[in-house]
Every structure is written in C-alpha cells, then in structure tokens.
Amino acid sequence: MSSFRVLDLVKPLTGYLPEVIAPERKVPFNQKLMWTGVTLLIFLVMSEIPLYGIVSSESSDPLFWLRMMLASNRGTLMELGISPIVSSGMVFQLLQGTQLLDVNLESKTDRETFQTAQKLFAILLSIGQATVYVLTGIYGRPSDLGVGVCLLLILQLVFAGIIVILLDELLQKGYGLGSGISLFMATNICEQIFWKAFAPTTVNNGRGDEFEGAVVALFHLLSVRKDKRRALVEAFYRQNLPNIFQLLATFIVFFLVVYLQGFRYEIPVRSTRQRGQNGLYPIKLFYTSNTPIMLQSALTSNFFIISQMLFQRFPLNPVVRLFGVWDARPGSAQLFASNGLAYYIQPPLSLTEALLDPIKTVIYVSFVLSVCALFSKTWIEISGTAPRDVAKQFKDQGLVIAGRRETSVYKELKRIIPTAAAFGGASIGALSVACDLLGTLGSGTSILLAVTTIYSYYEIAAKEGGFQKHIVEGFSEAF
C-alpha cells in the first residue's frame, strides 16, 4: 500500500516548468569554460539593464545589507538576484534534513521531483518578491506608477528571475563549472571591489571633487599635490571613500582565507573489505564552508529591513525604537542604525568607530562569533554531514577508523566533527569581523563568500581540467 507524499503534488507540473535538458555525454572542459563564460556574460548584461517604468530615486535602499550577498543590482533586471534560488534551496534542505519532507535522494525519480519542487518554489518566490517590491513602493508609489506599469515591472522581475534559475540549472546539470548561485555571487562582489578600486567617476564629499576609485585617486593625488607625503597619507586613509589601506586589507584577507583553506584535521581510516587499504578522511577548518556567515548575514539583514520599515512608519513608537533608530550618514541617503538593538549588531563602519564605542564592538563581535558557531553546528545536522551521517557513509563504504573498533566510529566522529564545525564557524565569523574592522572594500561577509567561492572554483577546475592543484597547497605549506 503506497502512502501519499507532498512531492507527489509536484509530479503533474513537471512537464509545464521550463527545464534545461541534461547533456547526453560528458561535456569537455573547454566547452564547460565556454558555457560558464556565456552564463556569466548574460548575468552581467542583465545587471546593467534598467527596469522599464521605475521612478528613479536617491532614497535609502532598504535592501542595502543584502545586495552583495544576493548578487542583486538595484533598479535593474537583477533586482531579485539569486534570492529566490537561495531561499528555495535553504527551505527545501531544511525540510529534507529535518525529515519534514519525505524524500529518498538515492532514488533518481525522487531526486528529480525534489529538484522540480525547488524550481517551482523559486519561481513562486520570484513572483511573490516582485509583487512585494512593486507594491511597497521601492520603485515609486504604485498610485503614481499606475496599474499597467506595476504589472510590467512585476513581469520584468519574474522573467529575469526565471532566466537566473535556468542559468543556474544549466551549470548544475554539467554544461558549466560549479553553480550559478556561487558564480553570480562571487562575480557581483568582485565587480563591486574592482569598481571601488578603479572607478574613474568623481564625487564631492565636501572636500571638492575626488575620484571614487582608490587606485585612480592615488595617482591623481600624487600628480596634483606638491606635498607627496601628504598625498600618500590622504590616498591611504581618506574618509567616506575607498582608500588604498582598504584595498590592501582586502588582498590580505583574500590570501589569509586561501591559506586557512588548507587547515584540516585528518582521521586515519582503513578498509574492512580490502586488506592493506589505508587512507585519510579530512575534516577542514571551514567544515561547513561559508554557510554560517551566509545565514548570520541573512538573519541580521532581514532584521535590519524589518526594523527600517517599522521605524519609517512608526518613528516615535518606543518598541520600534528599541529594535532600531535609523539615520542617514553625512553625504549619503543610506540609513544606518544609530541606536537600539540594530545598532549593536550592525558592524562598525571603521576601526576608529569600533575603538570609540568599545561596548558596541564587544557586543557585535560576541554576537557574530556565537551565532556563526551555532549555525555551523546546526547546519551539519540539516545538511547530512553530522557524525551520524558520516558514520553511515563509513559503514556503507566498509571503512573504519584505524586503531579503533568498528563500533566506536560514531563516538569518535561525534567527538571531532561538532567541535570542528563550531570552531570553523567561529573562525569564519572572526574573519568577517576582521574585514569589517579593517574596512575592506566590501563587507566581511561578501569578501569571505567571494574568496571561498573562487577557491572552490579553483578546486573544480583543478579536478576537471587536470592542471596541478599543488600550487595553492604549496602556498599554504609555505606559511
């Protein structure tokens, strides 16, 4: 007797959803590079095409805290970014990991239905988010825009969202390298860093016209100032604009994260099926990769968005003010928390600000480290990388820990993995805090996401393309 499952509701819709057909044969590495490049080009073009019908505004961006992480570009076709895909993926992984959704991922049929359900939910999220964005007045008051323009804006956002979903599916099914989510996120972050370093545009922050790009400003100041020492100091430490110190800090963090990627605890294992077969099972320092900092950033960013919306509507309400008081900084229309809970979990905007308010800094650092460690320990239970899951993999593959009895594998893994996950989560949280305090070109979260994604792409390319992986390993060992 077969029982009904929620996933069975999705099966009749499979033929109606847009789909990328899986390749019939293995795609050569050169073609994967080409398709990855084409996918990236489409993303970049969509990031520059403005939405038709919006009323341009210089007001505060309520989604400011999520833009870089979600590969979102305000006022363009990439307004939603990868938000629908990320949200859908996390929801379904949570449902599957907690066994609230009955699915057997070892079954090809179940796996395909599960992926179809994720895609359907991502499309529904695109429709829902697009509708909310338009009706809440992000592009202008709906009454001023009119019904026709509002519908047109929603259609543009939904169409762009579906294109992003299909581009991600194109890479996931083997036509390209990695996933669209990681590729778009890292590209968006690197694009923002490159712009802050080399932007030729000028801005006026009360000191006259200055070049926005840190490197361009350095050469400009050295060429026009007679006092070269003063020009260097200004280029390295100028306020409210990207500077050379921030650029150098970004490079330092980049190489530090690459170096730390090589840190791992190796468990000696042996095969019970083949005599003399020994090996090592590595547990990396970043056992859960960048997931903890993504979840922490998503949590705080959504809290900031809700707090801002409530404060703009009820600025005098004491409960709302307890959550956060929001003001614009000089020379910017963007709102930042100046009091309330939001202020204490908002990263300091500079090292000077962190030193001037040590209580806020201590609270912020403690919050990030503890939340990242907690999310990391929780995520291993959801994602199938907990000690119980790894012990099952060992049993299925006929592996045991060398020098231990077969029955003690789970106990040994339970002693190591949760500790490694929590420590790794706290470590990546500490790196994020360091980025925020040093003022890197981009938030700590975005820098870490970009670096870990670039490193994972290097590993994929090393595996797929066959070029030597020991270059990075040699760099790690050199330290």
Swiss-Prot record:
It is a multi-pass membrane protein. One of its GO terms (biological process) is retrograde protein transport, ER to cytosol. Residues 55-76, 141-146, 268-361, 435-440 are lumenal. Its main location: endoplasmic reticulum. The chain crosses the membrane at residues 34-54, 77-97, 120-140, 147-167, 247-267, 362-382, 416-434, 441-458. Residues 1-33, 98-119, 168-246, 383-415, 459-479 are cytoplasmic. Pfam families: Plug_translocon, SecY. One of its GO terms (cellular component) is Sec61 translocon complex. It is found in: Endoplasmic reticulum membrane. One of its GO terms (molecular function) is signal sequence binding. InterPro entries: SecY/SEC61-alpha (IPR002208), SecY_CS (IPR030659), SecY_dom_sf (IPR023201), Translocon_Sec61/SecY_plug_dom (IPR019561). Keywords: Endoplasmic reticulum, Membrane, Protein transport, Translocation, Transmembrane, Transmembrane helix, Transport. The keyword Transmembrane helix applies. SUPFAM superfamilies: Preprotein translocase SecY subunit (SSF103491). Heterotrimeric complex composed of SEC61-alpha, SEC61-beta and SEC61-gamma. Belongs to the SecY/SEC61-alpha family. Appears to play a crucial role in the insertion of secretory and membrane polypeptides into the ER. It is required for assembly of membrane and secretory proteins and is essential for cell growth. It interacts with other membrane proteins required for protein translocation. Upon binding to SEC62/63 complex, secretory precursor polypeptides may engage SEC61 to begin membrane penetration event. A cycle of assembly and disassembly of SEC62/63 from SEC61 may govern the activity of the translocase. This is Protein transport protein SEC61 subunit alpha.
